[in-house]
Amino acid sequence: MVEPDRAGCLYRSIEIGDGQPHSFPGELDTIMAGLACGDPNPLAWQVLSDCADAFLVCPDYVAAKGMRVYGMPLAGDPTIISGESGAVTLGALMRIQELPEYDRLREQLRLDRDSQVLLINSERNTDPDEIRRVVWEGGNPVPEPYRRYRNPFDEN
């Protein structure tokens, strides 16, 4: 499960660990408006808390990177025009593959170059101005320490 770091109610609920759904306690200040709910759906919580293998929260720049990569994919992959909430899953997968601090999670999820991962993209181009701000103008850039310019799915 992937949520914005400034709206991660499911993640917060898992962290608290009492089996109950919990609201996100702050402002829902994220470009991922479609995921900025703040309160877990009780039915979804029952299913996800039992079935999801991992819960992640991501800053806005992870979703923005996902949008840019969907819009300019690797050779052979389709171009997808995605909104922020839909693109965060791709951005999160790339982050997990790229950064050493996610080695343990990568092992836990058994992610390697032979993995087949289903990404759920829950948002199309619902806000053309915002998509242009992020994709054309470079809005929400990845901070320098986290930038990677190689294919994260290639082994070195």
Region locations from a protein language model:
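Glycine-rich phosphate/pyrophosphate-binding loop at beta-loop-alpha junctions
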Residues: M1-D50, P100, R104-D154
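Active-site-adjacent helical/loop segments in soluble small-molecule enzymes
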Residues: P40-L109
